[in-house]
């Protein structure tokens, strides 16, 4: 078989990078596939910290599979086409490893799919290593652990599955790190946003969802102090309005997540704010509102928005 590109979603986070790099290695070792892990964007601060810590080179960034002369791809940490490579509809999807909802996804041919409602795609990839009798190199264990820590906020998010806890402990042992100490330092590395422009900030970890025919952009930034982000509200709103006009979003929802106290502030702009308010049963004041206990876009924001937009 010819070369296969393996990649996570656009605006890649630690799980997208870690799961794709590790799965590309597994596919070579277990099944002899000619795989290369690539990325659909540059690593964010958190992921850059992870790659540097474990001495792993960042995957090269690609925009088109066809431009690489590649006809076949494997997706990790996503399946929705609008979150994937630009020419996803023009290539063959060989396989998917994901832990999200399945939506806006269709293929012409059968494929391999591994979908589990767990805390991270990295958790699934690690189990696949074990199932296939392939040892996980120390640096890849570090990347997989980081993906799990990132997506579950160090196992505190409601997306954390019971099986993620032993996975985290095993990966920490292989990687040679203290789970709690490393995890906290890693998460803190991702909260240093002072050098980011407002446009960069709202695009660090952002995904587009099609909700009842509306293109809704849901972004998330992690911080140790929500007020640090709200202090930049004016410039952030300008950037959001520009994104809405340029990209054609109907609405833009920004989660500002306090990783210390496990709460979020929702900053939202667009044409369906009544639906956003109904989703979370709050009232936006000056375009934002507090959402107690919310840390997960996947479990505590997108499903609620989906229900409200479909009502």
Swiss-Prot record:
Enzyme class at the top of the EC tree: hydrolase
What is the protein's name according to its record?
Probable manganese-dependent inorganic pyrophosphatase
Q: Which organism is it from?
A: Streptococcus agalactiae serotype III (strain NEM316)
Q: Which residues form a coiled coil?
A: none
Query: At which positions is Mn(2+) 1 bound?
Result: 9, 13, 77
Which lineage?
A: Bacteria, Bacillati, Bacillota, Bacilli, Lactobacillales
Which family, according to UniProt? Belongs to the PPase class C family.
- Under Enzyme Commission nomenclature, its number is 3.6.1.1
Residues recorded as binding Mn(2+) 2, renumbered to this chain, are 15, 77, 99, 151
What reaction does this enzyme carry out catalytically? diphosphate + H2O = 2 phosphate + H(+)
Q: Which InterPro entries match?
A: DDH_dom, DHH_sf, DHHA2, DHHA2_dom_sf, Mn-dep_inorganic_PyrPase, Oligoribo/pAp-PDE_c-di-AMP_PDE
Against SMART domains, the record matches this protein to: DHHA2
Query: Molecular function terms in GO for this entry?
Result: inorganic diphosphate phosphatase activity; manganese ion binding
Family annotation (Pfam families): DHH, DHHA2
Taking the first listed entry, what is the main subcellular location of this protein, grouped into a coarse class?
A: cytoplasm
Entry cofactors: Mn(2+)
What detail does the entry give on cofactor binding? Binds 2 manganese ions per subunit.
Xref: NCBIfam families: PRK05427.1
User: Where, per UniProt, does this protein localize?
Assistant: Cytoplasm
Q: Which UniProt keywords apply?
A: Cytoplasm, Hydrolase, Manganese, Metal-binding
Q: Name one GO cellular component term.
A: cytoplasm
Ion transport as a keyword?
Answer: no
